[in-house]
Design a protein with these regions (language model features):
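Glycine-rich flexible loops
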Residues: 1-191
Length: 191
């Protein structure tokens, strides 16, 4: 900010890092993040013709609908330039995930329709639209924890006193294989 001298890094997944008036520090942090993230691996998504799965379709688990709807009601998905940060989906079979779509405002019901994504080791094919950047990470987490079939992710401040593990994320871009591995490694039971 040229008026206040405040600097910050806003990364592609809209997380904010290094909020400071020390320009040299924020530039060092930015260079460090860029070097770390440049080593991340990604699987390119091929988008093919197809039809989206409507949010209220009976194939969409009722539990996923209820949780996402509740999160929306609680303000979990904050819009910035009419796009919300986060993603959600479900895994109905071994190599298939239905994921939320990229660059949507999940506060609008029509933006919650899901895209079918088929995975193999070296490719992922989406049908009808581009899936969330986090689709590969969703798939990796649900593959590691096969007892679960749904996943919901959003950015929000921690509740004071919350006993929830936090994984460092700044070196992993959302959608990278390393992001999925980092997230899966930090998963644990609560409650």
């Amino acid at each position: 900010d040229v008026q206040t001298g405040l600097n910050m890094i806003i990364c592609p997944e809209l997380a904010v890092y290094s909020i400071t008036h020390d320009r040299d520090k924020v530039l060092r942090d930015l260079a460090d993040m860029a070097m770390s993230r440049s080593k991340n691996e990604f699987t390119r998504t091929t988008v093919l013709e197809g039809t989206l799965l409507p949010w209220r379709d009976t194939k969409v688990p009722e539990s996923l609908q209820k949780v996402v709807d509740w999160c929306v009601e609680q303000g979990a998905y904050q819009a910035f330039n009419d796009v919300t940060v986060g993603h959600f989906g479900f895994k109905p079979e071994t190599d298939v995930l239905y994921s939320s779509r990229r660059k949507q405002n999940f506060n609008l019901p029509e933006c919650r329709d899901l895209v079918r994504v088929e995975f193999s080791k070296d490719s992922q094919k989406a049908f009808g639209a581009k899936p969330s950047a986090g689709a590969r990470s969703q798939y990796m987490v649900l593959s590691k924890f096969a007892q679960y079939d749904c996943i919901v992710h959003f950015h929000c401040p921690m509740k004071p006193g919350a006993n929830v593990a936090v994984r460092p994320q700044r070196m992993f871009e959302c959608g990278s294989h390393q992001c999925g591995e980092n997230t899966a490694a930090g998963m644990m039971e609560y409650g």
